[in-house]
Amino acid sequence: MIKILTISILFNFIFTINKILIPMDDSQTNHLKAYGVAFSSLEKQNKVEWLLNYRGGSFIINLDNSIKRECLLKNVLFETLSIEKISVIYSMLEQENMELVILDKTPKIAVYSPPNQQPWDDAVTLALTYAEIKYDVVFDDEVMNGDLYKYDWLHLHHEDFTGQYGKFYRYRNQNWYKEMENTFTKTAKKYNFDTVHKFKKTIAVKIRDYVSKGGFLFAMCSATDSFDIALSFYNVDFAHSIYDGTPIDKINISNVDFENGIAFENYELYTDPTIYEYSTIDYPSSHQPTTRSAESDYFTLSNFSAKWDPVPTMLVQNHVTNVNGFMGQTTGYNKEFLKSHVLILGEDLYSSQVKYIHGNIGKGTFTFLGGHDPEDYRHFVGDPPTELDLHRNSPGYRLILNNILFPAAKKKPKKT
């Protein structure tokens, strides 16, 4: 639960501290760097007030010269607040479907990414770099050594936890593919695994354990469904012989345990290495043509009670309700295969596609967002990274940055 400060408590300090409002509605000149300003304030040990559903999820920050200078340098719009204006804002928060959440810590952020250069971008590292938010890069060695527990928040992107090398078999003669294959095989042997798929499944289990003990997991694209598949099919060899030299275990492939997965169930696998798809989870499927154009592809963010459901409300803060869709190896999720406890944050109201989901695992949480890059509708292998200065008000990238601030929220003491 999130600690919600009442109006009476708030008035104890608003009279003595100058504050600025960073609006997050259509008036904002740079939404993405605004998150960086909020994060920077937390790094200076200054609390940030996140106004859920007020002008697109605006921030109130204590005014000092460094924050003001940062806003000016980053072209982030801010408004100086008077006591009267603050009073009006807090009164509105109390009366409307709005809420105030205190952000009071700087989340330690890790991005799971291989050491070798991959021929595609990562939307989260692009967002973090553009917003000037610090993060560390971790990979399999750090996971095996227990280093994940140094971090509050972990991101997974275009990764494959099934040991099928991203199902990029068509690129098997490319140098980057050969390097990936060689690196993964060496690392698996280093930890006494005879196949990459057994090793990668173990990595998925360790990440799940990290989340269940209180970690925050945010994943996009193929890292979402391949992660869940690795957990559910942990004891089944479904990797084609071209990957590990052994045939698919067709006898035991039905011995799936969907209880081990965190988000999906009752789906079927695609084991053919020439099909660029893991399972029937993905919707629409990557290997089947779609007639939808980029102009007509969008998903709708769900509406929640800010006072009763502050967590999902935080995750959907935006200046728009309908967000442009974007494709990926895993573009979205077939609603048919969602577990009952999974909360839908965004979906296509006219099809079976769910785009954005959230759930709990033990003491931690996970959030999955389908698609590869919110501002590159069809991101292909070898395409250059997206230039975010051309998309500084991107609604899709805002969803990523909402997840960055989510772990900073102050916890509410449990009632006795």
Write out the residue ranges for each language-model feature.
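Hydrophobic targeting/anchoring helices
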Residues: 17-122, 371, 378, 413
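Catalytic beta-strand/loop cores that center a nucleophilic Ser/Cys/Thr
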Residues: 119-122, 129, 225, 236, ...
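A glycine-rich, often tryptophan-bearing local segment used as a flexible ligand/cofactor-contacting loop or short
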Residues: 167-303
